[in-house]
Structure formats: structure tokens, C-alpha cells
């Protein structure tokens, strides 16, 4: 919807929603593309937004019932997602893992401060639950960036101490597994090449099988890894050469009945359409 501004500079909108929702709010400064913000909306709760423009800078000030949640959500988004504070170039300039931990703490301090102003304890609990996952992801992103820049993070004592504390059989620590695998295969580019040339997606699933014996974790993460390998196909990419290897590794460790059935069917289709395969009517 487009909100019309009254002659006195105010605007308002009443929105009926069934539950809590984050909505994009775009503000056009008349020059560049619209600036987008996130509004935290909740049924029967008010949110006030003051748009303050000073020269070429636009600042939004939030108040009302969900003002603190909205303020936190935008500070989090601006710090973690939109800024370059956690980009590969930034990571590569940080000398070691100990410095990385301190840097992350400093950059996330304003986000933590904004969360302390939120009185909605359900919201706070949900954010704190995801906080550890986010920080672990940032640590592994740092390790991957350094590894790609030629730094062997396996020799960083503090980083390996952090890695060795992760229990990969614990379902509560499952969020750390995918970024760990991403780093591990980056640090070990010759995995399994002595036996066979596996595509990276298949390598990741095989590493998962060696990393954890917990079947729930295996099913959860193998589904995530398989989905990541199938996603390019949705965008029109040809994955026909790599996906059979991925399916076969997936079938070795997953017990998910629906996904296993899908993988088996897809492998049969691939095998039946591979050049050089006899048509069904010609098979003896």
C-alpha cells in the first residue's frame, strides 16, 4: 500500500493482521531508490514512526507498543545483513580468531543494547535463542574467508578450541554443523579425491555422515544440504552431472522416508535418460 501524507506531514494506517508480522516500509527521498525498513507489527498494538530528514540523511524513530522491537529489528538488520562489517574483505583484515571474537562483540554491542530495551519477553527469548547460532555463523564465515585467503585456520589454537567444544551429536547445536562443514571442505580441498572425484555437494553430505552418528541430526542437516544443491535447478541451472552423486551420498545417511523415495525416483529417471542407456523396450 502507498501511504498518503497529510498537509501537516502526518500519515496513518490501520492494518488488520492475524498474528505478529514483519512488514517492509519504504521511504523515498525523491532522489535515489526507496530506503527500506522493517516494521514489527502485532495485533491490537500500536507503532509510531517519525521520519526525520536532515540534509541527505533519513532517520526513522520508532515508538508506541512495538517501537522497541522495530528499533531492534532494524539495528540488527543494518548491522548484520546490510553493512560491510562482516564481509569477506573485512574478515581478511582481522589477524586471528581471538581478534575476530573481540571484533564481533564490539560490532554487535549496539544490537544487544537495543534488545535490552524490549519488554516483550517472548520476543527477547526468541532473539536470544537465535543469537548463539548467528555468532557461530559469523565465526565460521570468518574462518572460511581466512581459509580462502590462504590462512590455515586449523593452526589457529583459539579457533580450533572453539570448534572442539561443539558437540555435533547434540540436536541443540545443529545450527553450527552446516557452517562448520562449509569451512571444513574449504580447509580440506582434496577430500576423497584419491578414491573418486566427488562434487562439493556430495562431499559435504559425506562429511556430515562422518561427523555425527545422531540420526535426527543426519536427517535434518542432509535435508538442508540436499535442498541447497537442488536450489540452482529452480533458477534454471543444469545440475545433471553433479546431482546423482549428491543423491547417492544422501541415501547413505538419511532415513527420511519421503526424501529417500524422492531421491530414488530421481536417480532412476537420471539413469534411464543417461546417454548410452538402453531404452526399456530394448533391454534383455
Please place each PLM-identified region on the residue numbering:
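Structural signature of alpha-solenoid helical repeat junctions
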Residues: 120-130, 222, 259
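Extended alpha-helical scaffolding segments
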Residues: 219-253
Amino acid at each position: 500500500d502507498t501511504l498518503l501524507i497529510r498537509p501537516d506531514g502526518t500519515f496513518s494506517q490501520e492494518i488488520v493482521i492475524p498474528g505478529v508480522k514483519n512488514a517492509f516500509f519504504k521511504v523515498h527521498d525523491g532522489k535515489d531508490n526507496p530506503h527500506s525498513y522493517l516494521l514489527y507489527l502485532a495485533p491490537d498494538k500500536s507503532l509510531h514512526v517519525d521520519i526525520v530528514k536532515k540534509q541527505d540523511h533519513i532517520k526513522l524513530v520508532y515508538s508506541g507498543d512495538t517501537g522497541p522491537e522495530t528499533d531492534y529489528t532494524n539495528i540488527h538488520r543494518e548491522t548484520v545483513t546490510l553493512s560491510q562489517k562482516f564481509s569477506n574483505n573485512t574478515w581478511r583484515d582481522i589477524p586471528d580468531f581471538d581478534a575476530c571474537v573481540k571484533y564481533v562483540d564490539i560490532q554487535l554491542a549496539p544490537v544487544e543494547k537495543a534488545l535490552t530495551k524490549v519488554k516483550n519477553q517472548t520476543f527477547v527469548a526468541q532473539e536470544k535463542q537465535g543469537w548463539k547460532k548467528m555468532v557461530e555463523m559469523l565465526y565460521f564465515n570468518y574462518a572460511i574467508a581466512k581459509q580462502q585467503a590462504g590462512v590455515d585456520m586449523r593452526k589457529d589454537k583459539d579457533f580450533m578450541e572453539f570448534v572442539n567444544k561443539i558437540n555435533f551429536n547434540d540436536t541443540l547445536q545443529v545450527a553450527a554443523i552446516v557452517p562448520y562443514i562449509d569451512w571444513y571442505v574449504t580447509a580440506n580441498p582434496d577430500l576423497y579425491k584419491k578414491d573418486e572425484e566427488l562434487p562439493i555437494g556430495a562431499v559435504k553430505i559425506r562429511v556430515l555422515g562422518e561427523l555425527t552418528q545422531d540420526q535426527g541430526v543426519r536427517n535434518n542437516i542432509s535435508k538442508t544440504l540436499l535442498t541447497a544443491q537442488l536450489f540452482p535447478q529452480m533458477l534454471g541451472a543444469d545440475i545433471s552431472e553433479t546431482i546423482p552423486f549428491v543423491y547417492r551420498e544422501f541415501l547413505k545417511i538419511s532415513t527420511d522416508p519421503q526424501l529417500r523415495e524422492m531421491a530414488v525416483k530421481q536417480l532412476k529417471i537420471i539413469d534411464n535418460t543417461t546417454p548410452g542407456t538402453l531404452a526399456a523396450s530394448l533391454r534383455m
